[in-house]
Amino acid sequence: MYFLGLLSLLVLPSKAFKTNFPDETIAELSVNVYNQLRAAREDENILFCPLSIAIAMGMIELGAHGTTLKEIRHSLGFDSLKNGEEFTFLKDLSDMATTEESHYVLNMANSLYVQNGFHVSEKFLQLVKKYFKAEVENIDFSQSAAVATHINKWVENHTNNMIKDFVSSRDFSALTHLVLINAIYFKGNWKSQFRPENTRTFSFTKDDETEVQIPMMYQQGEFYYGEFSDGSNEAGGIYQVLEIPYEGDEISMMIVLSRQEVPLVTLEPLVKASLINEWANSVKKQKVEVYLPRFTVEQEIDLKDVLKGLGITEVFSRSADLTAMSDNKELYLAKAFHKAFLEVNEEGSEAAAASGMIAISRMAVLYPQVIVDHPFFFLVRNRRTGTVLFMGRVMHPEAMNTSGHDFEEL
């Protein structure tokens, strides 16, 4: 399985933590960003990396003063901390992401591109290196095509060539002074892998009741599972939560699935940081039959409107105060865009096409079944720290190539 997150911030000229960091801060940010995206994308897939967003905005925060600083701290949930304490926490997260781990790969990289001859505070550069290990490079943004090629190559190198063409020459001009880029790459194998020979073509029913044929993986095994009430008295008021761990047990994917007759949009307003914590603490390990789509989702998001919706507005205006970054008082944040890629398959990483002969049936159900054949919400989290690495929903699964057979009995 691959998860990739990439966030880029363009600044243009104009007029196990060492800190007592609130456990739910990143989860709160995740939910807030998710709510902004679902309001703007009524019937679309959603995929983003809240950790990537938090760290990239943390780099911008290092350069901010005044109201600009206050807005960023408040919107990211840092108000309860002493000024600057959040950077130690973000550094801890970044260090965790880049620590070599035998069971999975989780890498994070940060890069700062500065216009040739443009003065950036030495203190800012030191802090960016200290907290985020950012690469700092001088570049000529007036050579927009060459800059785009150079940055895209950097992105490809830090996402195992999974994210390509992230920026274009149109994103840069002679007026561009500073670009911050953050990339996160995760590759993990399921602790209990799906056997490719069990994958079959299956109908996925969308919220508008249309159907699409997708490859559906299957296995019966021990997973963390629970059933929860949405608070209604209706028959469909119970939804399922399935947590599937990756090798090493530290990282897991959590699937949240409403009953088929209940649209996902009915369940989404319930999602809160506290509820995510409740799911994690309440699911119990038990034998479960799992039917999970094999799919990919790739999405690019213009975060400018999202961040504005969270209350981060001044940094995008001519009144922005980024004087901790540069003595040039004419800087403001012009663009903020984010790209993420998700691939789910049998191994967790790339797997060969299936061509099995095993038939699967709902007959004689002995264990709970999780049949993910309609829209669902998901998140990938660190089970030890609770940090949400990726969050999203699948409304329209983009099927990967498969040579499986139909479920004749389903």
Curated annotation (Swiss-Prot):
GO terms for molecular function: serine-type endopeptidase inhibitor activity. Its main location: secreted. It is found in: Secreted; Cytoplasmic vesicle, Secretory vesicle lumen; Perikaryon. Glycans are attached at residues 157, 401. It comes from the Eukaryota. Residues 1-16 form the signal peptide. The record marks 362-363 as: Reactive bond. Detected in embryonic ocular vitreous fluid (at protein level). In the embryo present in retina, brain, cerebellum and spinal cord. In adult, predominantly expressed in the brain. Keywords: Cytoplasmic vesicle, Glycoprotein, Protease inhibitor, Secreted, Serine protease inhibitor, Signal. GO terms for cellular component: cytoplasmic vesicle lumen; extracellular space; neuronal cell body; perikaryon. Gene3D superfamilies: Alpha-1-antitrypsin, domain 1, Antithrombin, subunit I, domain 2. Belongs to the serpin family. Serine protease inhibitor that inhibits plasminogen activators and plasmin but not thrombin. May be involved in the formation or reorganization of synaptic connections as well as for synaptic plasticity in the adult nervous system. May protect neurons from cell damage by tissue-type plasminogen activator. This is Neuroserpin. It comes from Gallus gallus.
